[in-house]
Amino acid sequence: MKIVFLEPLGVSVDSIESARKILRDRGHEVIIYSDRIPELNKERASDADIVVESNMPLDKDFFDACPKLKMLSVAFTGLDHIDLEECKRRNITVMNSAGYSTQAVAEETICMMIGLYRHIVENDSITRKCCGKSIVPGREISGKTVGIIGMGAIGCRTATLAQAFGCKIIAWNRTPKHIDGVSFVEKDVLFKEADIIALHLALNEETRNFVTARELSMMKKDAIIINAARGPVINANDLSEALKNGKIAGAALDVYDNEPPLKEDNVLLSAPNTLLLPHIGFATKEAFELRLGIVVDNILKYLG
């Protein structure tokens, strides 16, 4: 079979060549592109049996251009950038890379909590303007109540890391669990009691707009919210209004309704007390190496 990697996946040359060898030794043709150019995806994958990609959108036009395609090994956790209905209609197997970024995203969540609490961006700006004595005092996360929404692998790992900082953990999950040191509460209770809210939900019709003006109005005025899950789980307009009106103290976001770069008219760009990142939670060297292994394993499982 012809296997096409539409991008190099952010790993070392040695790692990518090792992956190539594993697949070639089993008799497959392997093409690995050293750059990422979405406009060339259809041309590059036109005669592929198996395609590897991360988070570039793949729609009906792409699949029309790839009539031989049998399998997608997606180097990403979420699949909302892929037309899964079209894949189902064409009997294309789709496998994601669940679990590769658990530690990376959990660490980023803690980083964003501290970044907001300690006003890292503002104090960096003060220092660069050579007026370092005019500091913005911060707060400590130790002793604060962290409310985690979505207790999958990332949510659980975030809880463990937050506990190491001395935080109290409350959580909401669609299916209640028993986890030592974690108190599971109703959604409304979490929004009312948490000092810091961290979202770790998958995106589906139930979780789209999971956080709206209603939930934001329940939060403490000095509370902050972190979203390292999927952008549409928070209503961006409602969040922007809550920040502008001082209903909550801050928000840190790594995900948005659409992948960065953000458009100039995005309402979050003008919202105060925000820490905005360009969707980097998954992006560590360690996570990328683990991801490549999962991608190759998925291909081998498919091939039998």
Please annotate each region the language model reported:
Residues R90-I92, A98-T145, I149, T160, ...:
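Phosphate-binding beta-alpha-beta segment of Rossmann-like dinucleotide-binding domains, i.e.
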Residues S18, I135-K221:
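Rossmann-like dinucleotide/phosphate-binding beta-alpha-beta segment
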Residues M1-A48:
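N-terminal glycine-/charge-rich "phosphate-binding" loop or analogous flexible N-terminal tail
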Residues P57-L69, L84-E86, E206-I225:
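Rossmann-fold NAD(P) dinucleotide-binding segment
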Residues S34, A75-F76, I92-Q103, N173, ...:
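Short beta->alpha connector loops at strand-helix junctions that form conserved
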Residues S54, A75, H200-L203, A228:
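Short, well-ordered coil/turn residues at beta-beta hairpins
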Residues V94, D222-G304:
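Rossmann-like dinucleotide-binding domain for NAD(H)/NADP(H)
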Residues A48, C66, E193-A194, D222:
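An anion/phosphate-binding loop that grips the pyrophosphate of nucleotide cofactors and donors
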